[in-house]
Amino acid sequence: MSVTEGRLNPVDQAVISQALLSAAREMGIKLYRSAYSPIVRDGKDASTGILDAEGNAVAQSDELIPMLVGSLSITFRSCAALYPVATLKEGDFYICNHPYHGAHHLQDILIFVPIFHDGTIIGFSAAVAHHLDVGGGAPGLNSTATDFYQEGLVIPPSKYNLAADWNDEGPLRRFIGANIRVPEQTLGDIDSQFAACAVGAARVREMCDKYSATTVRRAMAEMIAYTERRVRAAIAAI
């Protein structure tokens, strides 16, 4: 890899950028094709993306709902403020659906999985999905709710571990399932979110093996900087 003044040459940047976008798209396909509920499987009311180690959005699936990606960085930072990234271990994840901490509404559950490479966090794979039911006073969306506690189960910014808390009927899985009218579909869709995040993490690790973790991080930073330049130019032209 040839790097000039900390930036990759245009060819390397383009190749890695497209690989990151492809990984985000593959995450989206994995999510909706493995989902249980029609709202995700058919309606595709979900989104997936890859964040850098600070929680900045780098790439997103353009086959799902782009608007949902807007909540990723805000919700991520709410989780990281309570559970710093430096404390995360392999298998840990963030989860949240709290509207006051970045989520759109309680039906949108966000999951963030750290991407480790040689013991270092390179970034995060993220998935958000609108769930068919999250409890509350009525199935689905409660149109008679007078406060958001009536809308369903509130998951504040939290950190859990996949093996200890979710897999094999772990305590978090059982707790969420006990508050849901259709646990098979809601839990199945959360499983699909984890599966999508696993795909994203695997693809980023493959890039790190091929190009080096330093190079991938530089490519992520340049994607964000390039987007900022484009947006600033568009605003300046108004």
Descriptions of predicted regions:
Residues 5-117, 124, 129-132:
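Long, structured ligand/cofactor-binding scaffold of large enzymes
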Residues 7-11, 31, 60-62, 181-185, ...:
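Glycine- and acidic
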Residues 35-36, 40-43, 90-92, 185-192, ...:
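Short coil/turn segments at secondary-structure boundaries
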Residues 44-53, 191-202, 227-229:
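Core structural elements
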Residues 118-205:
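Mobile "lid/hinge" segments at catalytic clefts and subdomain interfaces of large enzymes
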Residues 198-238:
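Accessory "access/gating" subregions that flank catalytic or transport cores
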